Amino acid sequence: MSTQPNILWICTDQQRYDTIFALGNKYAQTPNLDQLVNDGTTFTNAFCQSPVCAPSRASFLTGRYPRTTRCRQNGQSIPESEVLISKILSNAGYKCGLAGKLHLASCSDGKVEKRTDDGYDPFHWSHHPQPDWEENEYTKWLKEKGQDWYDLQGEKINEYVHFGPPSEYSQTAWCAEKTIDFINAEKGKPWFFSFNCFDPHHPFDPPAEYLDRFNAEDMPLPSEHPAEKDTKPSFQLLDRIWAHNNPGEFHTEAMSDNDRRQVCAAYQAMVTLIDDQVGRILQALEESGQAENTIVIFMSDHGEMLGDHGIYFKGPHFYDCQLR
């Protein structure tokens, strides 16, 4: 066994800090994350440096502010001169791997993300579950199993929630499988692995068997204060009508209380899916005899408004639910 500790870096996408039972959410079903909270150190006042993906990821992978990395919004690319922690560890003799999302450069409209010298090898890239790129390794994995992502989509619950693929075909399960394969293959060497699933990022599409664990009627309504509209800028008021001010995508203003509760249940169900996959990985560490020599970091790139202040998804809104 290496005397240098292994590092398992689990980063989810758009997960609020208050989605874990051990941190006070009585509706959460997160036994494996609870174990990490109880056995480790929890940073309850940690704030990401931007409430959207790319600048936040560029910041925590370099230890520098978005204004310094010059990656200040989605669609911008991190300069090649910026050095990632994965490259530093690779230079120090660590075997570094990744499964899932990186998002340090633009990758929309079928354009594959351009990499810098990031030190990752293997690099199992899947920006999100949708098969928008031939290079999406999750899509390739589904095809190897005789599955098509579109065919795996389930029924619509309402205008805001639908069933996604069964858990065994989810991108989160694929990320866990790649992580476990790496852990077992690299035993005895110092390694660093980045697990970067897309969940619980919208769309709100948990597997049916996970949403069935939650009763939407039990979910709390978002925290909203109608009077605050009088003091907010126009772009924030527009986000209260359509999420991301994108007419036709997610009509926030038209939601009923039942719709809001259903979204909350779906979001929490996606977190439970993550929790189960984290449990698989922790079990693999134990079974391979590497648990005692592995530092496990669990975090998210930023949070989710989830209806608080009348807003869904994310954006230029500096509230705790997006930053902690």
PLM ranges: what are they?
Residues 1-324:
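Formylglycine-dependent sulfatase
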